[in-house]
Amino acid sequence: MSDIVSSSTDYSRRSPSSSSIGTNETDHTGFHEKRQGASSESLIPPAQRSSEESMPAPKLFPKLTSKPNPQLNLKDTLNKRVSDRLQALELNKSFDFSGTPRPMHPISHPLSQHKTPEFKHRKRNVESILTPKNPSLFSSSNAASQRGSLNTAPSNFAYSHSSSLQTSASSRPPVLSNGSFPRQTNTAPLNPPVHLKDNIRNSATPSTSQADIPTQYPINSTQKQQAKYEAEIEGYKAKLAGTYHEISVLQNTIVNVSGQLIAVNDQLQQLRSGKASTSPSTKDTNMRLVEGHNEETLALQRGKYTQEEVDKLIQERMEKVAEDLHAQYSAKHTQKINAFKANYARKYEATIQELQNQIGTAPNAPKISNSNWEEERRALKADNQTLQKQLEKAIQERQDMSDFLNNFKADMAKSDKLLMQQQSQQTGDLETLRLQLQALQEELRVEREERQQLIQMSEDLVIAMDQLNLEQKS
């Protein structure tokens, strides 16, 4: 965006010839806008006029004053308004730039990104992007209606408004005062002279006057940082508001849960009073519920609940209600089981009686004669006796093996005891031998010292004798 503002500054510092051309173009533009404002109703069809009246005017530039508003994000506002203006221009198809068709493509990305080819071969000026070069395109009625529907829309600058684009006060953007811009009262014909057309076509100046150039306002890093901090503050405020909302919702939930608990307690008291006889578990549950209600009453008298107290009370109440429901459902379950038993007893009573009668009449039935039955019985008896003998033999062998194992264990215990005694005795003998060995080593050391002393004495004696011999000879 800073490139666009700087380009507009470069445009204002051009040669005198370009400034004179801009003055002539300003005269032509002012006359054209006056002429178009007067005849826009006759040029625009009724259907198009109604749609244009209902369509809000595109906004191009924000209101920039000498003292900037710190809460206004200028960059985002300029990007949004430029995109809106480009989309509005795209609705009116493409314009003819110097006889060559040149379609206008809407820019969906912000202007702060990489520069498109549109910025490479044209002056980087906001109006050079949004308006065509050739003002002679608006000589026809259709072009006049298009210019009347777009360029005469209210913006931040003092344009003459046509009667076909009357909008409500709420949808109009703020308009600067007309004192800083000269009012054009030129009554030239609609088509400018030929030399003006050539100058405008050959020059790189746009078809708008200097009044159309936005007010220059550089955006420095301090303002960007301030806008960033303000955005963060707004985010924190939103989070704080959300936290307050959650707190209020939780407080309402606590109140609702407390009311539900009190209602459940009242229902339990009504059930207790309406029931003639209750079980001991139900009585204990009701007593606990009454105690819990008393605790709640004391807590209410003491002050508000804390979150831990609320969780504790809810847990206790849920446990009490669960125990009470378990007792009630257990009683109902037992009653159902007894009813099922009685029902099945009645259902199968005839079958049971019939089976009992059959069992009673079975001994009176005639015996079935079988010629091989006696032989099979004798064979089975013989097999039984054989198996009995084998079993007794196996039992005896097992007993013998058990006795052998017991004797072996006893012998092993005795052997272990003797081995331990021998080991302890050998340990004592080894200790004695070790002591004797130490004594012998000590004696040996003493003898070695004595022998060393004797050897030393003998050597001294030999030396003394040699000296005596030498003295005698001398």
Curated annotation (Swiss-Prot):
Subcellular location(s) of the protein: Nucleus; Cytoplasm; Cytoplasm, Cytoskeleton, Spindle; Chromosome, Centromere, Kinetochore
Amino acid composition bias (Basic and acidic residues), ranges on this chain: 25-36
GO cellular component terms, semicolon-separated: cytoplasm; cytoplasmic microtubule; cytoplasmic microtubule bundle; cytoplasmic microtubule plus-end; equatorial microtubule organizing center; kinetochore; microtubule minus-end; mitotic spindle
Annotated region (Disordered), positions in chain: 1-79, 93-114, 164-223
InterPro entries per the UniProt record, alphabetical: TACC_fungi
Biased composition (Polar residues): 66-76, 177-189, 201-223
Biased composition (Low complexity): 1-20
Keywords: Centromere, Chromosome, Coiled coil, Cytoplasm, Cytoskeleton, Kinetochore, Microtubule, Nucleus, Phosphoprotein
Keyword Cytoplasm appears in the UniProt entry: yes
Gene Ontology BP annotations: astral microtubule organization; attachment of mitotic spindle microtubules to kinetochore; cytoplasmic microtubule organization; meiotic centromere clustering; microtubule nucleation by interphase microtubule organizing center; mitotic chromosome movement towards spindle pole; mitotic spindle assembly; mitotic spindle elongation (spindle phase three)
One GO MF term: microtubule binding
Coiled coil: 219-273, 367-471
Domain of life assignment: Eukaryota
Positions of post-translational Phosphoserine modification: S17
Function: Required for bipolar spindle formation and proper chromosome segregation. Has an indirect role in connecting the kinetochores and the plus end of pole to chromosome microtubules by targeting alp14 to the spindle pole body. Involved in the emergence of large microtubule organizing centers (MTOC) in interphase cells. Attaches to the minus ends of microtubules and associates with the sites of microtubule attachment on the nuclear envelope. This leads to the stabilization of the microtubule bundles.
Assembly and interaction partners: Interacts with alp14.
Name of the protein described by the UniProt record: Microtubule protein alp7
Organism of this sequence: Schizosaccharomyces pombe (strain 972 / ATCC 24843) (Fission yeast)
Phylogenetic lineage: Eukaryota, Fungi, Dikarya, Ascomycota, Taphrinomycotina
